[in-house]
Amino acid sequence: MAKPRAARRPASVYALAGIRLFNGVTGLLMPTVLIRRLDPDRDLSPAAVYAFRLFGIRTILLGLDLLTNRGQRLQEDLREGVLIHGSDTATAALLGIRGQLPPRTAALTTLISAVNTALAASAADFGKRKGK
């Protein structure tokens, strides 16, 4: 008996999953790479290493969810992605506004997070239309 074919996901879901997997693996296995990109002029903080590893594994799992979940669970994941990445965008922008990140770093992290937010919104919109 043949299995029913799974519905195809939009490119935005695959792009967002890829970004999450890349960032998650980097955060988990090579947190110093990400820390140095954010704050190249300071000594490494053990707390920053911990935080990147902590969120690294969570980010990997969120990426895998986009590739493996289906139906209502996938739609929930897509809606949650807008909140997750929107929060990241606001955080990056605030760090820049407050001068807690160098201007170039703040602009780049805000832009990257905004692209992720747009991908999440696009995917969530697709999921909403497919669910109707």
Describe the predicted segments one by one:
Residues 1-132:
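Short amphipathic, positively biased membrane-proximal segments
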